[in-house]
């Protein structure tokens, strides 16, 4: 009986050990597969830097020096800069009767849940820490106002907070009840000023709800069902406040729109709502609310300019007809799933935002046939570039000259080091100068916006080239001008911005025959009116206001398809390469087609409903790339020969610092890497680049985000915070306002400092690369990640990001501009087929990425989840190699977006030019092993690896490494612990199994067996 109990115990222990063995083994395998993330979480490193044997000891090697002495000092600088950026980006939308500024000491009632729950940023991977940020109560109290509705504020404080899909705003009747004090006296409506705060928040993973087919509309009635329109409770509250104002109980109503996404603003000028003043403040970042207080008091005079068109009603935006995710007809026959059978068509072509509203307006004024019934004021609430001031300005003395300038002269904001390194490229530009005078009574700044108009010709109509009435061509900004003070602002406009892409005939950028115009204006609408004035039109012809012909310069051209047949930045031949992204040019389109918007026939092309496409055999085949595509890749003649592998010569990565990318020494250096090392570099990119100890390549930390560093300063071993053992290393980086506010500043010097500060945060956190900035386009106000991106305009996006990228990369941090390209929505972003014609693709969506690459040497991109047509962006060779490395000339490497989709295949990526995956599968190189004897695949693995190595070498990722040191692999404490646990549980399981076997043998009387077991 006793022996039986012992045997039972041994069985139990054996089973326990077996289970533990499996658990520990599985855990070890998972940890090994995701070692990069485990290292970051536990703040360990797979390598360490040691001095070579016999080398003289030296201090910690820094290749990029910080301006700051501590995290505390850096955070203080960041908070001050956030406040400055917000203060200069806030847009004054309305100020009837000079309602603002409100005098300090005024009595104010804060209304709206957002007053206690401000929108600081967005959600998802780009979210940043704003845990210590103030709310509106803190800020207005600190600004010197007397807040008189404390009971209501207490109620707001105790109410559930707003979510990305629910405003949670109470009914007007509830507000009136909660605004009473302990004596049942109303604390609202006692002669005070109302500041009503409206908040909306978006983020990664979902677009905002809208009442259009193809979009998620949610189930909560509070959504109305349009998240970017006032809901019933908000409307009732504003109307109730308006009645109180009409009765003399309220002095004024100011609305603050605390949202990165533009909301429908028809209510602002509807008398029923009684709004006197309105501010757009975006999402405000860590300390941006203090700037809102400064604007309310007049300590800051607002000077922001809208980076988007704001619609009376967002549903009037024709893009909404095709914003969503739609299922191909007949898709069910192919049984593909929603990562393969969804699509969206950019039917608007180039007519996005103001390029639609202003062009249609001009055609109505000009009396163009088929312009249709279009009333500008019924559609546009506030035009692109709009922004009021507490003072007035006059622009005069316009001069324009045609010049030849070098790239160094064009990007004047760059550091001397950047200028010295810049390619000595000469381009034709127009130098536009205008005198700006403050004609008002208070000091202020003024943005100077330059717009271009290209003629819409018969050639354009024949070859389906579309031309907007105006396009932003550049901007500048004055210093703070005192009353009566003047400043001459000069803006450089590349002649390239006067070209149009001719997809169907020449396949190049062309200058059209006829009169082109440059005009200086306050916004896009004023720009059109200026040009219409030159054309002899007046308000009698339907103009909304008289334009100013003195601010217009005319330029004559003959047709030219030669000058810009070479790429703007590199001189490479321009060719039509995106046929497969355009439904009408796609080789497998079958019966599918799309009628794009055209100003040749507005009535016939701007039609309701979305474009309906049908799945066919070719689309189904293209969305399901397989090994046959790899076998069919013949490569260049040079790629037919297997490269040298594993030929060690002792050269370390640090030794290559002085060699150009195409120097022959790099070939010799790359010969050292084995196939496995090349494959590991190209198989591992989860917020890092992989370490190769044999050549002294460290593992880097590459992380989010587009609105500032999202991680703690302690994340990277070679960051200033960790190396200096800073006591505040567990703090997180600076949270900046949304990028729309950054763009609204139109101040290159300020945005450059934003880039420098983000670069500093990255240095202190140990980042070598930054997953940002965000260069997708505000195609629709409802896109979830509008807060990460700058504008509806590709040129403004590219120009603003150029200077921000310069600032970041000056600190040794390479930028991954994202998401490349056409990832302009969140719904079904993983695999959705995005169809867009090549003119729009090049002039809007690629322009945003092109300008930072050409003018700031933006090093890297993150490719998008979506497809261009039927081909995933991360395996589209024409996009990633022919355009990105060829025409645009990007020097660094490309990483995928998060690697959790079935259609992302590593070998397809590398063949296309997408170098590393943002993956979760660790060191597994089995996918590449299948092609170890394929010279094309191996050559492209080598090229991708070289891009990674070259970029990291010239970054702060090499901090701590010198010619006297070497990088060695180490086993960290957690790896050792898991290994010990794995072998211990295995050993114990074997012991208990042996003891159990011994008992069994004894019980059967098999002494020989028992003897052997012993």
Where are these regions (language model features)?
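Glycoside hydrolase catalytic-domain context in secreted enzymes
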Residues: 1-502, 512-520, 524, 575-1014
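Terminal connector regions
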Residues: 494-569, 573-574
């Amino acid at each position: 009986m006793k022996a039986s109990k012992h045997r039972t115990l041994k069985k139990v222990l054996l089973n326990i050990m077996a289970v533990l063995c499996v658990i520990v083994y599985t855990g070890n395998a998972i940890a090994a597969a995701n070692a990069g993330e485990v290292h970051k979480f536990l703040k360990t490193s797979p390598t360490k830097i040691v001095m070579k044997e016999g080398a003289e000891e030296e201090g910690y090697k820094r290749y990029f020096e910080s301006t700051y002495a501590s995290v505390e000092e850096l955070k203080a600088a960041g908070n001050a800069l956030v406040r400055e950026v917000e203060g200069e980006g806030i847009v004054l939308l309305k100020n009837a009767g000079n309602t603002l500024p409100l005098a300090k000491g005024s009595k104010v009632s804060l209304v709206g849940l957002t007053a206690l729950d401000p929108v600081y940023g967005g959600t998802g991977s780009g979210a940043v820490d704003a845990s210590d940020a103030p709310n509106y109560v803190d800020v207005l109290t600190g600004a010197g106002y007397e807040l008189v509705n404390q009971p209501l504020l207490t109620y707001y404080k105790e109410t559930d907070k707003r979510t990305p899909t629910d405003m949670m705003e109470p009914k007007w009747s509830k507000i009136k009840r909660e605004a009473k004090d302990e004596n049942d006296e109303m604390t609202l409506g006692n002669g005070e000023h109302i500041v009503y705060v409206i908040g909306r928040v978006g983020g990664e993973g979902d677009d905002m709800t809208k009442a259009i087919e193809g979009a998620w509309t949610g189930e909560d009635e509070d959504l109305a069902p349009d998240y970017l329109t006032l809901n019933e409770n908000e409307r009732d509250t504003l109307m109730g406040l308006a009645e109180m104002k009409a009765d003399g109980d309220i002095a004024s109503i100011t609305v603050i729109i605390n949202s990165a996404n533009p909301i429908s603003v028809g209510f602002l000028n509807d008398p029923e709502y009684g709004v006197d003043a309105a501010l757009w403040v975006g999402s405000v970042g860590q300390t941006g609310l203090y700037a809102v207080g400064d604007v309310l008091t007049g300590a800051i005079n607002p000077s922001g300019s809208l980076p988007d068109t704001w619609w009376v009603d967002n549903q009037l935006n024709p893009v909404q007809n095709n914003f969503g995710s739609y299922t191909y007809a007949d898709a069910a026959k192919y049984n593909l799933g929603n990562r393969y059978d969804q699509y969206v068509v950019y039917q608007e072509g180039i007519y996005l935002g103001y390029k639609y509203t202003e062009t249609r307006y001009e055609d109505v004024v000009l009396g163009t046939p088929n312009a249709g019934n279009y009333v500008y004021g019924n559609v546009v609430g506030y035009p692109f570039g709009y922004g009021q001031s507490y003072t007035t300005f006059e622009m005069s003395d316009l001069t324009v000259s045609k010049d030849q300038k070098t790239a160094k002269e064009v990007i004047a904001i760059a550091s001397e080091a950047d200028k010295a390194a810049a390619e000595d490229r000469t381009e034709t530009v127009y130098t536009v100068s205008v005198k700006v005078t403050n004609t008002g009574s208070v000091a202020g700044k003024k943005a100077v916006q330059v717009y271009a108009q290209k003629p819409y010709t018969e050639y354009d109509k024949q070859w389906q080239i579309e031309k907007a009435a105006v396009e932003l061509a550049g901007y500048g900004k004055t210093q703070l001008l005192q009353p009566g003070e003047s400043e001459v602002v000069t803006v450089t406009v590349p002649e390239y911005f006067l070209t149009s892409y001719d997809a169907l005939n020449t396949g190049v950028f062309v200058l059209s025959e006829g009169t082109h115009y440059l005009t200086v204006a306050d916004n896009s609408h004023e720009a059109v009116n200026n040009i219409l004035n030159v054309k002899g039109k007046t308000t009698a012809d339907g103009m909304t206001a008289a334009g100013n012909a003195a601010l217009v310069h005319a330029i004559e051209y003959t047709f030219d398809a030669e000058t810009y047949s070479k790429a703007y930045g590199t001189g490479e031949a321009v060719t039509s390469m995106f046929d497969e992204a355009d439904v009408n040019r796609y080789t497998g389109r079958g019966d599918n087609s799309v009628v794009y918007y055209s100003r040749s026939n507005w009535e016939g092309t701007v039609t309701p409903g979305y474009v309906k496409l049908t799945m066919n055999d070719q689309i189904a085949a293209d969305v399901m790339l397989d090994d046959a595509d790899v076998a069919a890749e013949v490569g260049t003649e040079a790629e037919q020969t297997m490269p040298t592998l594993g030929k060690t010569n002792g050269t370390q990565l640090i030794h290559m610092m002085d060699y150009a990318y195409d120097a022959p020494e790099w070939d010799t250096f790359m010969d050292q890497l084995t196939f496995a090392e090349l494959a590991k570099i190209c198989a591992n990119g989860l917020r890092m680049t992989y370490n190769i100890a044999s050549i002294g390549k460290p593992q880097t930390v590459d992380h989010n985000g587009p609105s500032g560093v999202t991680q703690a300063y302690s994340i990277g071993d070679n960051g200033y915070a960790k190396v200096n053992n800073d006591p505040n290393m567990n703090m997180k980086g600076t949270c900046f306002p949304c990028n729309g506010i950054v763009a609204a500043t139109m101040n290159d010097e300020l945005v450059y400092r934003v880039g420098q500060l983000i670069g500093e945060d990255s240095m202190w956190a140990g980042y070598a690369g930054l997953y940002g900035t965000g260069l997708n386009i505000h195609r629709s106000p409802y896109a979830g990640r509008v807060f990460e991106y700058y504008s509806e305009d590709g040129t403004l996006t590219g120009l603003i990001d150029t200077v921000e990228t310069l600032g970041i990369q000056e600190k040794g941090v390479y930028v991954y501009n994202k998401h490349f390209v056409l990832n302009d929505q969140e719904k079904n972003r993983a695999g959705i087929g995005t169809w867009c014609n090549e003119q729009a693709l090049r002039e809007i969506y690629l322009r945003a990425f092109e300008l930072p690459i050409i003018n700031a040497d933006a090093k890297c991109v993150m490719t998008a989840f979506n497809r261009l047509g039927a081909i995933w962006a991360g395996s589209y060779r024409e996009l990633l190699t022919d355009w990105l490395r060829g025409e645009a000339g990007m020097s660094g490497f490309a990483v995928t977006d998060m690697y959790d989709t079935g259609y992302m295949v590593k070998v397809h990526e590398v063949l296309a030019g997408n170098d590393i995956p943002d993956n979760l599968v660790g060191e597994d190189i089995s996918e590449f092993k299948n092609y170890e004897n394929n010279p094309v695949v191996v050559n492209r693995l080598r090229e991708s690896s070289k891009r990674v190595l070259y970029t990291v070498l010239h970054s702060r990722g090499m901090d701590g490494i010198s010619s006297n040191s070497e990088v060695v692999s180490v086993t960290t404490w957690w790896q050792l612990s898991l290994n010990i646990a794995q072998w211990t549980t295995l050993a114990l399981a074997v012991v208990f199994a042996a003891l159990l076997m011994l008992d069994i043998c004894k019980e059967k009387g098999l002494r020989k067996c028992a003897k052997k077991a012993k």
